[in-house]
From Swiss-Prot:
Pfam families: Ribosomal_S8
Positions of disulphide bridges: none
Any one annotated GO CC term: ribosome
Name the UniProt record assigns to this protein: Small ribosomal subunit protein uS8
Source species: Shewanella loihica (strain ATCC BAA-1088 / PV-4)
Function of the protein: One of the primary rRNA binding proteins, it binds directly to 16S rRNA central domain where it helps coordinate assembly of the platform of the 30S subunit.
GO terms, molecular function: rRNA binding; structural constituent of ribosome
Coiled coil: none
Lineage of the organism: Bacteria, Pseudomonadati, Pseudomonadota, Gammaproteobacteria, Alteromonadales
Similarity comment: family membership: Belongs to the universal ribosomal protein uS8 family.
Keyword Kinase carried by entry: no
Self-association and partners: Part of the 30S ribosomal subunit. Contacts proteins S5 and S12.
Keywords per UniProt: Ribonucleoprotein, Ribosomal protein, RNA-binding, rRNA-binding
Record GO biological process: translation
Amino acid sequence: MSMQDPIADMLTRIRNGQAANKVSVSMPSAKLKVAIAQTLKEEGYITDYTVAGEAKPVLEITLKYFQGQPVVETIQRVSRPGLRIYKGKNDLPKVMGGLGVAIVSTSKGLMTDRAARQQGMGGEVICYVA
């Protein structure tokens, strides 16, 4: 059976891995998943990520903790296959009053809500991270 929402699966693996205090989590790789992992790394929510394998690449994300507590408090899928959520540049949400980030898919690639606002772009809101 094929996976209906691989992004939700990725976010759930990160959430469950941190709840179980795992060092890292691995999952099947895809370009969009790697772009999300890159954004999470740039924002400081994960330590690192690697892609290994040729035929079936595997994305391994090294989770980040601060004083034994997970850095990611909440990670929530917004736009999903059954209900896509698009926001214009003026309607992009501020997660936790600006403390968290919304990951947005724009015509110039994946970026945070802050970067999209600076570039004057809207797009599909993939997830919230705080």
